[in-house]
């Protein structure tokens, strides 16, 4: 790991210990499974967008004080396939309360929320599910082979999708192997019962996606050229997400041509006066290029 991820992992483990002291895992797990099943992630038309809510970015600083309910409502109205919500408190000013508010707001739109944080333990997936989340981000560099398998197994048990995040070709190889071990692959022939926590699984309703983050973890600068450089390493059986540095419709068109089916957009939408309009324009550009 890098220094930034080391610090984030250490802070995450400290919060995990505090959470364990407040609520035993057995109680939390029961609460998670008692929470109504969230909407599934539905990918349409060859190119999709995950919109992100965060109050702060380590590289850009504070992103404003937008109220979460109208902001995520605009994301859904613009056509976002899912909404990513930061829950990390120190660097991103996020919380589980933000996640729960977004989930409650978006249920009426049929749009799932995903927990974005520096997750290191299944307990944190139970927290997310109990807050109403339908998905979560897993960072492959923060997890051992065994831990990644444990996390993907837990997510599958909870009926949650995962975005497994990579930063380079070696990460992509590890992430893809971990997804293959822990999640059914996104195949049109693959189905699961709809009557329990499992999903109808196909490429349009994936259990797992591969995320590629173009941020340099030493400097926190974005390096968009990495999307093209890593395109040949992308697994064709998984939907792939371009993360960080996506700010314009042209960016969406470019990564769509490189083979990415999804973009995750955060800061640009948090700063936009009309986020729904920005999402529509980005989706149109990506779908025209895909």
Located regions from the model:
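An N-cap/entry alpha-helix motif that binds or orients negatively charged groups
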Residues: 1-66
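Conserved, mostly hydrophobic/aromatic
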Residues: 8, 51, 75, 128, ...
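N-terminal active-site wall of soluble small-molecule enzyme domains
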Residues: 48, 53, 59-163, 169-174, ...
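Glycine-enriched alpha-helix->loop->beta-strand junction motifs that scaffold or abut catalytic
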Residues: 79-80, 105-109, 130-136, 156-161, ...
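Glycine-rich phosphate-binding active-site loops on the catalytic face of alpha/beta enzymes
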Residues: 81, 85-87, 130-147, 209-219, ...
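Catalytic cores of alpha/beta
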Residues: 120-132, 168-183, 236, 242, ...
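Catalytic alpha/beta core domains of metabolic enzymes, predominantly
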Residues: 183-208, 216-218, 223-250, 266
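C-terminal helical cap(s) of enzyme catalytic domains, especially alpha/beta-barrels
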Residues: 230-233, 256, 269-290
């Amino acid at each position: 790991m890098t220094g930034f991820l080391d610090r984030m992992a250490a802070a995450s483990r400290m919060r995990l210990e505090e959470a364990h002291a407040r609520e035993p895992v057995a109680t939390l797990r029961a609460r998670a499974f008692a929470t109504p099943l969230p909407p599934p992630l539905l990918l349409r038309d060859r190119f999709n967008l995950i919109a992100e809510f965060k109050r702060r970015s380590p590289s850009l600083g504070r992103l404003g004080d937008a109220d979460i309910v109208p902001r995520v409502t605009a994301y859904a109205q613009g056509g976002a396939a899912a909404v990513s919500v930061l829950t990390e408190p120190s660097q991103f000013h996020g919380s589980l309360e933000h996640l729960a508010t977004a989930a409650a707001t978006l249920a009426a739109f049929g749009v799932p929320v995903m927990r974005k944080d520096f997750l290191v333990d299944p307990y944190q997936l139970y927290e997310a599910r109990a807050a109403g989340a339908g998905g979560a981000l897993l960072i492959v560099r923060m997890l051992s082979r065994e831990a990644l398998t444990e996390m993907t197994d837990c997510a599958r048990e909870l009926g949650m999708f995962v975005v497994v995040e990579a930063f380079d070709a070696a990460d992509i190889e590890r992430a893809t192997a971990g997804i293959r071990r822990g999640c059914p692959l996104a195949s049109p022939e693959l189905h699961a019962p709809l009557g329990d926590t499992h999903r109808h699984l196909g490429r349009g309703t994936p259990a797992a996606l591969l995320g590629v983050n173009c941020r340099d973890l030493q400097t926190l600068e974005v390096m968009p050229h990495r999307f093209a450089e890593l395109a040949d390493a992308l697994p064709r059986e998984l939907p792939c997400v371009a993360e960080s540095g996506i700010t314009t419709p042209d960016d969406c068109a470019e990564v769509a041509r490189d083979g990415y089916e999804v973009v995750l957009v955060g800061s640009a939408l948090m700063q936009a006066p009309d986020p729904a309009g920005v999402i529509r324009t980005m989706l149109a550009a990506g779908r025209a290029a895909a």
